[in-house]
Curated annotation (Swiss-Prot):
It is found in: Cell membrane; Endoplasmic reticulum membrane. Disulfide bonds: none annotated. It holds the Pfam family Cation_ATPase. One of its GO terms (cellular component) is endoplasmic reticulum membrane. CDD domains: P-type_ATPase_APLT_Dnf-like. The chain crosses the membrane at residues 69-89, 92-112, 296-316, 339-359, 899-919, 923-943, 973-993, 1012-1032, 1037-1057, 1083-1103. Keywords: ATP-binding, Cell membrane, Endoplasmic reticulum, Lipid transport, Magnesium, Membrane, Metal-binding, Nucleotide-binding, Phosphoprotein, Translocase, Transmembrane, Transmembrane helix, Transport. The lineage of its organism: Eukaryota, Metazoa, Chordata, Craniata, Vertebrata. It comes from Mus musculus (Mouse). Residues 12-36, 1179-1209 are annotated as: Disordered. The keyword Transport applies. It is an enzyme of class 7 (translocase). This is Phospholipid-transporting ATPase ID.
Length: 1209
C-alpha cells in the first residue's frame, strides 16, 4: 500500500513508538490509531491491547497479598493491626494476643470471602467471553479463533445473531449496498434495530479471496468511551475515504436480520468502547459515614487522653507507693524511671481500652445495609407487573441517605411522563387539526368525542393509531398540496427502519418514540414509509409506490436540535426536508407571510399549553448546481482530520437556512400513573422537587400544573427568560424583591437590601410568606450558573416551592445538581430514565434510574432503579426513613454498650495501682462484641421500625427528623457516651461497694478478683440486654431469639469456661476454674446484679416517660393515635355484638365512608392527612422540628444555611 501525500507527516512515518500497549506508560498516550488489514506483523509494532478482557482483580497467587493490602487501606483495619503488634510485646501487653486477632481475622476473613466470591464470578464471566469463537481470516483462510486471540487488523466474519467480538469497521455484508442491522441492547439497552453501512469502496468485497488481498489502512481517533461518535479515514489504492460511526460495529452488539458480514478490527479488548465505558462510578459516602469517621477520630483522641491519665497515675504510684509492696510481693525487675513505667503503662492501657472503637462496628454496619438493600429488592409493592421489573438497590452504601433527602431533581420525559408518544395535533399552513368541536362550536371533551377517524381505506394503516379530527383526512383525500407535503416530510425525514414480516404487516423500529409516532401518523394518513436502502427511500403515497433518491442525511444531535434529509424525487427535483425545535427552526425560515408565522406560533403555544411536545417542519428546494457544489464541500469537511464535526456543522448550517415553513406537530406524552400523588406526598415531607427538562417552556409549565408541582393557589410563578447576564440578574433580583416585599407586607419585618454581596447574601428563605415557583430557560440558566451569579440564582430558587428548568442540556442538569450540593447542607437525589440523565444521576448524592423506553444507561449509572416514578415515595418515606432510623438507633446503642464495657477498666485502674490489669476474663473481652452483644443489635438495626409502613406514607412529616439529622448527630453521640460512662460507673462501684463488706454463706469474705469480674461481666450483659429491649420499637421473633438467646449463650459459655474440664486440659489458659458456679450461687451476687441493673435502667425509663408525656415526637403521637383507633374499633365491635339496630344513621355513616373513599381516590385529600395530623400535634414535634430547622439555618452560612419555609402540617 502507498500512503498518499495528503497524509500528515506524523501519519506517513513507517512506524510509531510502542507506547500504546494495554498498560500505557505515563509518559506516552495514544494520539491516533493505525490499523492495516491482514498485516499482523505491522500492527504488532504498536503493541495494541489484545482482545482478551480481564475484569477480575486477583488470581490464585496474588489474591492473599493483594486483598490484604486493599483491606489494610482501611484506617480501622490498620489501627487494629497496630494494636495486635502492641499485644505481642510482653512488656506492655496485659491481654492475650487472641483478644484482638480473633475479631480482626474474623473481619478480614468475611471480607476476603466476599471479595473472592465476587472475583470468582468475574473470572467465570471473563473466561466465558474470552473463549467465544469467531471466524478470522488468517493467511487467506477463514479459521475458528477464540476471541482472546483476535488482534487489531484482523478481518472477522460475523453471521446472523452473533455477538460482535471487537470494534469493527464494516467492510461488506450479505445485504445490498453493504447494509447490516444490529441490536445494541448490551451497549445502551435499546432493543430496536439500528442500521450500519459499509463504505461503497469496500461493500463489494464479499469474497474471501478479495478480502485476503485487501490491504487498506485505517487511521482514526484513539480509544475513547463515546458510543455515538467515531472519526477516521481509510487509505486504500492511493485514495482516502471518510469513516464515521455509521460504518462501525461495536463490541457487544448483535448482528440481526443479516446473513453475514465482514469487519476489520480497529479496537480490541480494553480499548473497545464497551470496555471504555465500564469504568468505575465515583464512590459515594453517606453523611453518617462522614460523621462516623469524625467521631471515631474523637474517640481515638479520648482513648489517648485516658491512656495519658492512667500513665501519669502509674508513674506517680510507682514512685510514691509501689516500692512498699516489693518487699513481700513477686515483682518484675524494677524499672529505673517512673517516666518509663508510665510510658509502658500508656501503651498497655491503649490495648485494654481499644474496645471503645470496636472492629465489629464496621462489619455490623455493612451487614445492616445489606439487609436494607434486600428489603428494597424484595418489596412487592415496588414491583411492576406490566414490565416484570422489580426495584433494585444497586449499591448497599446509601440506604440511610434515602431517609435524609431534601432536594429531588427529576427529568420529565419518561420519568414523570410515560415516554409513549401519540400523534395528537398538528398545524398545516396555518390550520390547526386535532381538536373536535360540537354543533355549537365548543371544543368536545374526551368523553364526548365521536368515533375516531376511519382509516379502513388504507390497508397498510396501523390499527392501534387513533385520531379524532376527520377534517385532516378529508384534506388528504381532497388533495390539499400543503397537507400532502406535510405528511411526505414525515414519511421521508427520519431514521426509522421498517420490517415487513408478512405482506402488508409493517413494523417500525425507531431510535426515539417521537420519530415512531410521526412516521406512524404519516402511514395512517396515506403516506406509508415502506422500505429504505442506503441511497433510496420508498414511500407509498395514497397507494402509489414512489422511490426517492436519498442524497444526504443531516443527523440530529443535542446541539443542532434538528435533522434534515435531502432527497431527489422521480422528476429529478431536489428538496431538503427539515424538522426540529421551534426555537431553532423559526430563526432559519425564509420570511413567509406574517399571517402564517403568527398563526403557527399561536398553535405552537396552544399545543405547549396542553402539555404537548412540539416540532416545526420546513422544506427548501435546491437547484442541481448548488447541491453539487455543497455536496463537494460536505465531502471535504467529512474527510478533515481536525475539527471534523465543527466543519460539518457549519456546512449543515449553511444549507438549513432560508427554508419555507410547512407546519408543526404536537405529540402527547402522558403522565405516569401516580405522579401527582407522589409529588404532593413528597412535598408534604418537605422535599423540594426541581424538574430539569429539554422541553420548551410552555410544555414544561403545563406538565408542572398537571403533576401538581404548580398550582393556581401559588402567589406567583416567576419566569426567567433573559438572554444576557444583566437581564437574568435583574429578573432574579426582581423575583427575590417581590417575595421579600410580600413577606414584609404580612408583618415578617424583613428588610430587603438591593445590593446583595455574593459572600453574604441575605437569606430570603426565612422571610418568604406565600408559595412561589421559578421557571427558567436553558439560555438564561447558562448565565445563572456563571460563577458571579450562581449564588443569586440558588438563593432565589431555594426560596421557591417548585423549580422548573426548561431547554436544559445534560451538562446543565449536572451543573444545577452540583450547585445545590456545593452550597446547601442537604442530600440531593436525581432521577431520570435516559442517557441524557446519566451525568445528573452520577452527580447527585443518590442516583435513581427509571427502566423505561430510552434504554438502560440511566439504570446502569444509578444507585437504585425501578420502573415507575410513583415508587419513589415508598423508596424514601418507607425504606429510606426506616433505614435512617435503624442505622441511627444501631450506632447510638453500639457506642453506648462499648463505652459501658470499656470504661470499667478506667475506673478499675485507680484501684489496681494503674497496673493495666483488666477487670474481665480475657475470653469475655474477646467474645463480648462478636458473640454476646452482636446479634441483638444487628436484629434491631435490620428489623426495627417506629411506625408501620402505612403510617409512614400517611404522615409524611415523619420524614423530617432525617432531613434535620435529629436521630444521630454529635449531640446524640455525646448523650450515648454519657449514658455509657454513667453505666460503667455504676457497674464498677456498686459491686465494689457491696463486695467490700459482703460475706459468703459460710461467713468467708466474698470479695476476690475473680468473683468481682464475674459479677461485673454478668451485670454488664444483663444491663445492655435490657437496654436494647427498651430501644427496640418493633419486636419480632428474631429479636426475641437473639436477645434472650445471647443471654443464654453468655451463661453457657461462662460455665463452660469456668469448668474443671477445660482447666484440666488447658490450665494456663482457663484460670477461673469453678468461679462462676461459686459466685453465682450466692444470693448477695444476684441482689447486686439486680440493684446494678435497676439503677442503670430506671433513669432511662423515667426520662423516656417524662419525654413522652411532656414533649413527644411525631412518631410517638402517631403511635398513640393508632392505639386510640384500635381501642375505638374494639369498642365498635363490642357494640355490634351487644345488639343490632336498623337506624338510618348507620346507613348515613356508611355512605359517608364511601364519599371519603372517593376523596382518597381522587387525590384531593393529600393535604388532609397533614391537616388532620395538626389537630393532635400541638403536643407533638411540629414546633420543635421547625425551631430546629430555623436554628439549623441560622447557624449555617448563606445560602447553604438558609432553611426552607416549613410546610405547615
Amino acid at each position: 500500500m502507498t500512503v498518499p501525500k495528503e497524509i500528515p507527516e506524523k501519519w506517513a512515518r513507517a512506524g510509531a513508538p510502542p507506547s500504546w500497549s494495554q498498560k500505557k506508560p505515563s509518559w506516552g498516550t495514544e494520539e491516533e490509531r493505525r490499523a492495516r488489514a491482514n498485516d499482523r506483523e505491522y500492527n504488532e509494532k504498536f503493541q495494541y491491547a489484545s482482545n482478551c478482557i480481564k475484569t477480575s482483580k486477583y488470581n490464585i497467587v496474588t489474591f492473599l497479598p493483594v486483598n490484604l493490602f486493599e483491606q489494610f487501606q482501611e484506617v480501622a483495619n490498620t489501627y487494629f493491626l497496630f494494636l495486635l503488634i502492641l499485644q505481642l510485646i510482653p512488656q506492655i501487653s496485659s491481654l492475650s494476643w487472641f483478644t484482638t486477632i480473633v475479631p480482626l481475622v474474623l473481619v478480614l476473613t468475611i471480607t476476603a470471602v466476599k471479595d473472592a466470591t465476587d472475583d470468582y464470578f468475574r473470572h467465570k464471566s471473563d473466561n466465558q467471553v474470552n473463549n467465544r469463537h469467531s471466524q478470522v481470516l488468517i493467511n487467506g483462510v477463514l479459521q475458528q479463533e477464540q476471541w482472546m486471540n483476535v488482534c487489531v487488523g484482523d478481518i472477522i466474519k460475523l453471521e446472523n445473531n452473533q455477538f460482535v467480538a471487537a470494534d469493527l469497521l464494516l467492510l461488506s455484508s450479505s445485504e445490498p449496498h453493504g447494509l447490516c442491522y444490529i441490536e445494541t441492547a448490551e451497549l445502551d439497552g435499546e432493543t430496536n434495530m439500528k442500521v450500519r453501512q459499509a463504505i461503497p469502496v469496500t461493500s463489494e468485497l464479499g469474497d474471501v479471496s478479495q478480502l485476503a488481498r485487501f490491504d487498506g489502512e485505517v487511521i482514526c481517533e484513539p480509544p475513547n468511551n463515546k458510543l455515538d461518535k467515531f472519526s477516521g479515514t481509510l487509505y486504500w489504492k492511493e485514495n482516502k475515504f471518510p469513516l464515521s460511526n455509521q460504518n462501525m460495529l461495536l463490541r457487544g452488539c448483535v448482528l440481526r436480520n443479516t446473513e453475514w458480514c465482514f469487519g476489520l478490527v480497529i479496537f480490541a479488548g480494553p480499548d473497545t468502547k464497551l470496555m471504555q465505558n465500564s469504568g468505575r462510578t465515583k464512590f459515594k459516602r453517606t453523611s453518617i459515614d462522614r460523621l462516623m469517621n469524625t467521631l471515631v477520630l474523637w474517640i481515638f483522641g479520648f482513648l489517648v487522653c485516658m491512656g495519658v491519665i492512667l500513665a501519669i497515675g502509674n508513674a506517680i504510684w510507682e514512685h510514691e507507693v509501689g516500692t512498699r509492696f516489693q518487699v513481700y510481693l513477686p515483682w518484675d525487675e524494677a524499672v529505673d524511671s517512673a517516666f518509663f513505667s508510665g510510658f509502658l503503662s500508656f501503651w498497655s492501657y491503649i490495648i485494654i481500652l481499644n474496645t471503645v472503637v470496636p472492629i465489629s462496628l464496621y462489619v455490623s454496619v455493612e451487614v445492616i445495609r445489606l439487609g436494607h438493600s434486600y428489603f428494597i429488592n424484595w418489596d412487592k409493592k415496588m414491583f411492576c407487573m406490566k414490565k416484570r421489573t422489580p426495584a433494585e438497590a444497586r449499591t448497599t452504601t446509601l440506604n440511610e441517605e434515602l431517609g435524609q433527602v431534601e432536594y429531588i431533581f427529576s427529568d420529565k420525559t419518561g420519568t414523570l411522563t410515560q415516554n409513549i408518544m401519540v400523534f395528537n395535533k398538528c398545524s398545516i399552513n396555518g390550520h390547526s387539526y386535532g381538536d373536535v368541536f360540537d354543533v355549537l362550536g365548543h371544543k368536545a371533551e374526551l368523553g364526548e368525542r365521536p368515533e375516531p377517524v376511519d382509516f379502513s381505506f388504507n390497508p397498510l394503516a396501523d390499527k392501534k393509531f387513533l385520531f379524532w379530527d376527520s377534517s385532516l383526512l378529508e384534506a388528504v383525500k381532497m388533495g390539499d398540496p400543503h397537507t400532502h407535503e406535510f405528511f411526505r416530510l414525515l414519511s421521508l425525514c427520519h431514521t426509522v427502519m421498517s420490517e415487513e414480516k408478512n405482506e402488508g404487516e409493517l413494523y417500525y423500529k425507531a431510535q426515539s418514540p417521537d420519530e415512531g409516532a410521526l412516521v406512524t401518523a404519516a402511514r395512517n394518513f396515506g403516506f406509508v414509509f415502506r422500505s429504505r436502502t442506503p441511497k433510496t427511500i420508498t414511500v407509498h403515497e395514497l397507494g402509489t409506490a414512489i422511490t426517492y433518491q436519498l442524497l444526504a442525511i443531516l443527523d440530529f444531535n443535542n446541539i443542532r436540535k434538528r435533522m434534515s434529509v435531502i432527497v431527489r424525487n422521480p422528476e429529478g427535483k431536489i428538496r431538503l426536508y427539515c424538522k426540529g425545535a421551534d426555537t431553532i427552526l423559526l430563526d432559519r425560515l425564509h420570511p413567509p407571510t406574517q399571517e402564517l408565522l403568527s398563526s403557527t406560533t399561536d398553535h405552537l403555544n396552544e399545543y405547549a399549553g396542553d402539555g404537548l411536545r412540539t416540532l416545526v417542519l420546513a422544506y427548501k428546494d435546491l437547484d442541481e448546481e448548488y447541491y453539487e457544489e455543497w455536496a463537494r464541500r460536505r465531502l471535504q469537511a467529512s474527510l478533515a482530520q481536525d475539527s471534523r464535526e465543527d466543519r460539518l456543522a457549519s456546512i449543515y448550517e449553511e444549507v438549513e437556512s432560508d427554508m419555507m415553513l410547512l407546519g408543526a406537530t404536537a405529540i402527547e406524552d402522558k403522565l405516569q400513573q401516580g405522579v401527582p400523588e407522589t409529588i404532593a406526598l413528597l412535598t408534604l415531607a418537605n422535599i423540594k422537587i426541581w424538574v430539569l427538562t429539554g422541553d420548551k417552556q410552555e410544555t414544561a409549565v403545563n406538565i408542572g400544573y398537571s403533576c401538581k408541582m404548580l398550582t393556581d393557589d401559588m402567589t406567583e410563578v416567576f419566569v426567567v427568560t433573559g438572554h444576557t447576564v444583566l437581564e437574568v440578574r435583574e429578573e432574579l433580583r426582581k423575583a427575590r424583591k417581590k417575595m421579600v416585599d410580600s413577606s414584609h407586607a404580612v408583618g415578617n419585618g424583613f428588610t430587603y437590601q438591593g445590593n446583595l454581596s455574593s459572600s453574604k447574601l441575605t437569606s430570603v428563605l426565612e422571610a418568604v410568606a406565600g408559595e412561589y415557583a421559578l421557571v427558567i430557560n436553558g439560555h438564561s440558566l447558562a448565565h445563572a450558573l456563571e460563577a458571579d451569579m450562581e449564588l443569586e440564582f440558588l438563593e432565589t430558587a431555594c426560596a421557591c416551592k417548585a423549580v422548573i428548568c426548561c431547554r436544559v442540556t445534560p451538562l446543565q442538569k449536572a451543573q444545577v445538581v452540583e450547585l445545590v450540593k456545593k452550597y446547601k447542607k442537604a442530600v440531593t437525589l436525581a432521577i431520570g430514565d435516559g442517557a441524557n440523565d446519566v451525568s445528573m444521576i452520577k452527580t447527585a448524592h443518590i442516583g435513581v434510574g427509571i427502566s423505561g423506553q430510552e434504554g438502560i444507561q440511566a439504570v446502569l449509572a444509578s444507585d437504585y432503579s425501578f420502573s415507575q416514578f410513583k415508587f419513589l415515595q415508598r423508596l424514601l418515606l418507607v425504606h429510606g426513613r426506616w433505614s435512617y432510623l435503624r442505622m441511627c438507633k444501631f450506632l447510638c446503642y453500639f457506642f453506648y454498650k462499648n463505652f459501658a464495657f470499656t470504661m470499667v477498666h478506667f475506673w478499675f485502674g485507680f484501684f489496681c495501682g494503674f497496673s493495666a490489669q483488666t477487670v474481665y476474663d480475657q475470653y469475655f473481652i474477646t467474645l463480648y462484641n462478636i458473640v454476646y452483644t452482636s446479634l441483638p443489635v444487628l436484629a434491631m438495626g435490620v428489623f426495627d421500625q417506629d411506625v408501620p409502613e402505612q403510617r409512614s406514607m400517611e404522615y409524611p412529616k415523619l420524614y423530617e427528623p432525617g432531613q434535620l439529622n435529629l436521630l444521630f448527630n454529635k449531640r446524640e453521640f455525646f448523650i450515648c457516651i454519657a449514658q455509657g460512662i454513667y453505666t460503667s460507673v455504676l457497674m464498677f462501684f456498686i459491686p465494689y461497694g457491696v463486695f467490700a463488706e459482703a460475706t459468703r454463706d459460710d461467713g468467708t469474705q466474698l470479695a476476690d478478683y475473680q468473683s468481682f469480674a464475674v459479677t461485673v461481666a454478668t451485670s454488664l450483659v444483663i444491663v445492655v440486654s435490657v437496654q436494647i429491649g427498651l430501644d427496640t420499637g418493633y419486636w419480632t421473633a428474631i429479636n426475641h431469639f437473639f436477645i434472650w438467646g445471647s443471654l443464654a449463650v453468655y451463661f453457657a459459655i461462662l460455665f463452660a469456661m469456668h469448668s474443671n474440664g477445660l482447666f484440666d486440659m488447658f490450665p494456663n489458659q482457663f484460670r477461673f476454674v469453678g468461679n462462676a458456679q461459686n459466685t453465682l450461687a450466692q444470693p448477695t451476687v444476684w441482689l447486686t446484679i439486680a440493684l446494678t441493673t435497676a439503677v442503670c435502667i430506671m433513669p432511662v425509663v423515667a426520662f423516656r416517660f417524662l419525654r413522652l408525656s411532656l414533649k413527644p415526637d411525631l412518631s410517638d403521637t402517631v403511635r398513640y393515635t393508632q392505639l386510640v383507633r384500635k381501642k375505638q374499633k374494639a369498642q365498635h365491635r363490642c357494640m355490634r355484638r351487644v345488639g343490632r339496630t336498623g337506624s338510618r344513621r348507620s346507613g348515613y355513616a356508611f355512605s359517608h365512608q364511601e364519599g371519603f373513599g372517593e376523596l382518597i381516590m381522587s387525590g384531593k385529600n393529600m393535604r388532609l392527612s397533614s391537616l388532620a395530623l395538626s389537630s393532635f400535634s400541638t403536643r407533638s414535634s411540629s414546633s420543635w422540628i421547625e425551631s430546629l430547622r430555623r436554628k439549623k439555618s441560622d447557624s449555617a452560612n448563606s445560602p447553604s444555611g438558609g432553611a426552607e419555609k416549613p410546610l405547615k402540617g
